[in-house]
């Protein structure tokens, strides 16, 4: 439709009004704060799983002298299905800790198969993964999801089948990567089917190649919410720069997560085969400060820790100084 003619005086008025509005928008834009960097990463530690360990976690924060830990991190035993279903009573205490402060995160490691550290042969593992991919074990994960919702922690970060690229656990990926991916995705869909859940599912390999390149195990963006990494100071003699730049190392992990549009995390990290190594400790904490993971949680027991473990005084000093300065 052809528009009606506008008088010159009206056009001048409209032009003036437009200029004023543009200036106002510009002024508002200039006064608006620039996007801030990602907030300081939440931190926590694995200090144990007993009910009393919730207090120990907070004591770690008091020792650091800064903000309290916001990440509570525990594991479900993988010896039998009843424990993978969430039977252990200590979950109640950790759920209560999480509910006490909406800023907190509850991170729960969940094995994918029972007899999780029984060192079963590859053929048995492959058969078990295929059973899982066909739905044989769905009911166990449905029970777990219902328990977590009933405990008031429907937003639990579920670290499912961690360190799958290694050989430690029965839920390892190497014997049948396709079945592993299908089974992992199936568990996620089963748990997401439970009403009122808001779980976040974390895919967490170990740093480096290990037994299989961990990207081969990645089950897909639709079923992964967080890309984690377990990053201990190993093997012996490998410096921090090597840990950054090795194939499937720290730098590759962050690039992978960002390429897939996922936040990243470090649910396990700490000292290991290189002993009391302040260079590693400084390197990891500097990496966190630069990259801003969603959260990081040190394994605070020997041979990994810096607070409960008294064997690493130089690394302890670095951890305390940098974490206190960071105000994590």
Task: Give the positions of each predicted feature.
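Distinct, well-ordered alpha-helical segments
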Residues: 57, 207-222, 275-284
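Acidic (Asp/Glu)-rich catalytic clusters
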Residues: 58-67, 89-108, 115, 143-153, ...
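Substrate-binding cleft of extracellular glycoside hydrolase catalytic domains
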Residues: 81-203, 314-319
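Aromatic-lined carbohydrate-recognition surfaces of secreted/lumenal glycan-active proteins
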Residues: 161, 184, 188-212, 262-275, ...
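Glycoside hydrolase catalytic-domain groove-lining segments
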Residues: 90-97, 102-105, 109-111, 219-274
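Secretory targeting and sorting signals
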Residues: 2-33
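Substrate-binding cleft of secreted/luminal carbohydrate-active enzymes
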Residues: 37-51, 263-328
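Boundary/entry segment of secreted carbohydrate-active catalytic domains
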Residues: 32-83
């Amino acid at each position: 439709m052809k528009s009606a003619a506008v008088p010159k005086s009206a056009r001048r008025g409209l032009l003036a009004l437009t200029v004023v509005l543009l200036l106002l928008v510009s002024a508002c834009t200039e006064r608006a704060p620039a996007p801030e960097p990602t907030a300081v990463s939440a931190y926590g530690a694995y200090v144990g799983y007993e009910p009393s360990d919730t207090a120990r976690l907070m004591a770690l924060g008091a020792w650091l002298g800064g903000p309290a830990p916001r990440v509570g991190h525990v594991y479900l035993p993988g010896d039998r299905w009843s424990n993978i279903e969430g039977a252990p009573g200590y979950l109640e205490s950790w759920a209560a800790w999480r509910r006490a402060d909406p800023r907190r995160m509850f991170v729960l490691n969940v094995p994918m198969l029972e007899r999780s550290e029984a060192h079963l042969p590859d053929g048995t593992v492959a058969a078990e993964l295929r059973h899982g991919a066909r739905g044989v074990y769905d009911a166990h994960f449905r029970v777990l999801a219902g328990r977590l919702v009933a405990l008031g922690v429907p937003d639990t970060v579920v670290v499912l089948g961690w360190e799958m690229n290694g050989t430690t656990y029965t839920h390892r990926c190497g014997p049948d990567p396709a079945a592993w991916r299908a089974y992992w995705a199936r568990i996620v869909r089963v748990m997401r089917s439970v009403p009122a859940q808001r779980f976040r599912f974390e895919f967490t390999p170990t740093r480096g190649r290990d037994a299989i390149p961990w990207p081969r195990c990645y089950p897909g963006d639709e079923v992964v919410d967080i890309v984690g990494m377990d990053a201990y100071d190993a093997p012996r003699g490998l410096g921090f720069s090597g840990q950054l730049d090795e194939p499937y190392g720290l730098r590759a992990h962050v690039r992978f997560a960002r390429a897939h549009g996922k936040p990243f995390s470090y649910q396990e990290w700490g000292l290991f085969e290189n002993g009391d190594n302040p260079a590693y400790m400084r390197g990891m904490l500097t990496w966190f400060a630069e990259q801003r993971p969603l959260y990081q949680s040190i394994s605070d027991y020997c041979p990994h820790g810096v607070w409960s473990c008294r064997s690493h005084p130089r690394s302890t000093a670095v951890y305390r100084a940098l974490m206190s300065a960071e105000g994590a």
